[in-house]
Curated annotation (Swiss-Prot):
UniProt key word Disulfide bond: yes
Protein name, per record: Putative neurotoxin-H
Nucleotide-binding as UniProt keyword: no
Species the sequence originates in: Lychas mucronatus
Primary location: secreted
Cystine connections: 25-45, 32-54, 36-56
Compartments, record wording: Secreted
GO molecular-function terms, A-Z: ion channel regulator activity; toxin activity
Source taxon at top rank: Eukaryota
Tissues in which the protein is found: Expressed by the venom gland.
GO cellular component, one term: extracellular region
Residues making up the signal peptide according to the UniProt record: 1-19
Alphabetical keyword list: Disulfide bond, Ion channel impairing toxin, Neurotoxin, Secreted, Signal, Toxin
């Protein structure tokens, strides 16, 4: 019984995370960039058609 409840909770949490990522990446990634920009990072959408996951990465500019 506890295993069933645990699996159900994990599935609900993961589906909520994916829905949020799809929302952030649905309009070409501008919302993802805005979301990640709050932490001084750059948002990159990737996955199927570039709409599955919003990932925040640190951007380092090289000075020559």
């Amino acid at each position: 019984m506890y295993a069933t409840v645990t699996v159900t909770v994990l599935l609900l949490i993961s589906s909520g995370i994916f829905c949020q990522n799809e929302k952030l990446c649905s309009n070409g990634g501008t919302e993802c960039n805005r979301h990640c920009g709050q932490n001084n990072t750059v948002g990159i959408c990737h996955g199927q058609n570039g709409k599955l996951k919003c990932e925040c990465v640190e951007y380092k500019r090289k000075m020559f």
